Amino acid sequence: MSGSSNQFTPGKLVPGAINFAEGEIVMNEGREAKVISIKNTGDRPIQVGSHFHLFETNSALVFFDEKGNEDKERKVAYGRRFDIPSGTAIRFEPGDKKEVSVIDLVGTREVWGVNGLVNGKLKK
C-alpha cells in the first residue's frame, strides 16, 4: 500500500489504545464499610453481584451481624451491597460461610424489582 504507514509514532493517539493515569484507583473512598458473615444453607451455589440489594437475595442465604449473631430479619443487609469492584460477584457454594465487607447503597437510594420487597425508596 502506498502512502500508508503502520509505524507507531510516540505521542500520537493510537485507535483502541488504553491510557492509564498515574496512581491508584480507590474504590468506594469515604464510604463506611461493615464486615458481616453470610452462609449458604441451600443445596445449590448462589452468586450475588456487586450492586445487588443484599436484603433481597436468595432466601437460602443466612446473614450474621458484626458480632456473629444470626440476623433473621436481614437488618444488616437492608440498603446495602457488597464492597467489591463493579461488575464482580461473590459466589457461595452450598454450606459456605464467608465474611464480607458491605456498604450502603447511594444515589437516590431506591430499589425496584429484584424480589419486590422494597419497590421504592429505602427507609433508612
UniProtKB/Swiss-Prot annotation:
Q: Which UniProt keywords apply?
A: Cytoplasm, Hydrolase
GO-annotated biological processes:
urea catabolic process
Q: Which GO terms describe its molecular function?
A: urease activity
What catalytic activity is recorded? urea + 2 H2O + H(+) = hydrogencarbonate + 2 NH4(+)
Q: Where in the cell is it found?
A: Cytoplasm
- Its chief place of residence is cytoplasm
The record's listing under InterPro entries reads: Urease_beta-like (IPR002019), Urease_betasu_sf (IPR036461), Urease_subunit (IPR050069)
Q: What class of enzyme is it?
A: hydrolase
Enzyme Commission code(s) on record = 3.5.1.5
According to its record, what are the GO cellular component terms?
Answer: urease complex
Instruction: Identify the metabolic or biological route this protein is part of.
Output: Nitrogen metabolism; urea degradation; CO(2) and NH(3) from urea (urease route): step 1/1
Similarity comment: family membership: Belongs to the urease beta subunit family.
Assembly and oligomerization: Heterotrimer of UreA (gamma), UreB (beta) and UreC (alpha) subunits. Three heterotrimers associate to form the active enzyme.
Q: Which NCBIfam families match?
A: urease_beta
| Name under which the protein is recorded | Urease subunit beta
Q: Which organism is it from?
A: Ureaplasma urealyticum
Source lineage:
Bacteria, Bacillati, Mycoplasmatota, Mycoplasmoidales, Mycoplasmoidaceae
Q: Which gene encodes it?
A: ureB
